[in-house]
Amino acid sequence: MSFYVPGISVVIPSFVSGAVGTDGANLVDMKLYSALASLAKQSIRKDLVEVLVVLNGDGVSSTQTNISREFDQGLTSQFPELNIRLLRSLTPGAGRARNLGIASARRRFITFLDDDDALQPRYLESGLKEADDGVVTLLPIVDTIDGHSFRDNSLNARITTLRGTTAPIASAPWVLGFNASKIIPTEIAQKYRYDELLRSGEDVAYFAHLLEISGLLLRTPKVGESSAYVRTIRSDSVSRQRESFDFNVTQRLECIAQLRTINEVAPKHRALHTLEESQFGFVKSYLKSHPDDTQRAIDTAVAIGVPGLDWEGLRREKANRLVFSYCFPPYADTSANVTAKVIRNDAELVDVYYADMERVRGRDESTRLIVDPFLVHAEEIDAVPSFAHWGAICSYARQAARKAAKRAKGQDGYDSMYSRALWSGSHVAAALFKSKHPGTRWEAEFSDPLSVGVDGTPRSGELTRGVTTYQMKKLVECSDWREISYSTHFELTELVTLLYADEVIFTNENQQRVMLERYPEDLQSFVRSKSTIRHHAVPTEEMYHLVEADYELDPKRINIGYFGNFYANRGIGDVLTALEHHPHADEFLLHIFTSKPEQLSRELWNHPAFSRLRINGYMPYLTFLNVATHFDALVVNDTDTSGSTFTVNPFLPSKYADYVGSGVGVWGITVDESPLSKLPLTFSSAAGDIEQACSVLDELLRQARYNAR
């Protein structure tokens, strides 16, 4: 059952300047009267029309007097045939005014009219005749410039091509880029609001919400004469503002940020992408005329929170550094995030080649905010992603190395190159490039041992024949250690990297020892001489605030955070057991962020400490960084290698680096002589030692009570 009265509501926002005459004559610009006069001339029955005039601006306060009543009476008496409702908003802005008008609309359909525009006499009759539920009706538009009308404008030409058609709204996204010429069901209009913070482009952001409605149609009827919207073109209109960084860049990026909050129901049409590209077109045009503002524009996009825009071709600088990163933002992966942190810490312009990881990894678009300021060229390689399949790895490596070589040729090469594994394809691509460009300095980082797995046994990886295999083997044969044997592609990749990288980066000394001890002493010495021990990259300070999270903590309790997979018999299980037995356990709250929160909740449902837990799913990386800054303590646990073949524990959790930059106390649950146990920790307990874990809770409680004094 519809609660709307038959007919159409016409919403007219009208700005009222603070500079008004005492007689009220200048309260509203005279152009409003022209708009109302065009409504008075409509051929439709007037009882089917309600006119909502929304006065807004500083001058509205002056109308809350006798003058206001006189003005209202004067307006309605001048247009007695119109059902005019006058609404007022002290806050200026067409978006706010339209929101007030939309919320107040009572008729079944709604349309918008700017106060300096007009409607031809048959506009409402023609539009209402074709209007229907689930349909947006599009009508012609003519331009008026200095009193002269022009039907042959670019927008009307596009509307003309649709005459007589009914199609999905997403098939013509350009229709959503303006307020005029549309009649929509009021029920749909009232589902959404104009963004009142946008200084321009609020019409695009508002109408783009229609892409969220399944099955919504666009109807463009064949209408007769005198059925067009009459748009007044002025040099000072919002859409025709003088070119400036604020309007052409900042405001367009703000609009794009709003567009990205919309969930498109038919993404195959790429309608949202089209609207975004239209907005970004303003940015590109401006930067082509003002190339020195390019870095400022990119930094503005990052500050606003708009990642992944196509800045390539707008920079004048070239990158002197090449990066091969098999997994890279926007793909959600620890390796991708660490490489992004390295790039941001280095603060050097780079070209990056990475693999299409769509089949095996989700996307975290926000992580591009980390690297966007430093990307000159970022190219995704079309290859089947695989951790261990040699053919798939080689496909990426060959393509990436070839494309990088072509780009290097066009810009006098690269000074340096960085690759990181795990995801061994990064090192394979770098090795192929290095073989053809020996003058490029290669920095190769190992996050973990490559040739062996977490238990210390060799990783299985069949080394099949092929061009890449031949090239990699040839590199070994041309070295001073051609006699070293290898049986898997992981072993071959590790060996070639150790031989040819100009700098080999290990995350800790144990890892360096474990990786090198399988090789001859002279090779070990050779690699050590060019090695660097560098812990996982710590996020820069601003990275913790690139995204603001709204996760709530309990201000009356001590909040402990744990991000990672949960194993009751390892590490974090110690905290759970300590909470079970601590005499003041109710003063603590353990927040767990894990990959399978529902499963973990079921497993721990009957645990005595369950009431002290908050179990959540994983967060996007930058959201996690921001949330991490609000805890009282963050828990990181060691990898237990007691049942492995390792002589020492080679694993340093990358999470430690993320925690240590947060400014929050880090609680390490460690095993003897591990890399983590040798790093600065605010709190520490040995894995499996519940008494020590309880002591950490005691210390947290003492700190909380001291700070509360």
Protein language model features and the residues they cover:
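Short, acidic, metal-binding catalytic loop of nucleotide-sugar glycosyltransferases
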Residues: 29-48
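Glycine-rich, basic loop-to-helix element that forms the pyrophosphate-binding segment
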Residues: 86-105, 541, 546
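Conserved donor NDP-sugar-binding/catalytic core segment of glycosyltransferases
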Residues: 122-153
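Acidic donor-binding loop at a coil-to-helix junction in glycosyltransferase catalytic cores
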Residues: 199-206, 651
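Catalytic core of nucleotide-sugar-dependent glycosyltransferases
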Residues: 227-234, 240-270, 293-304
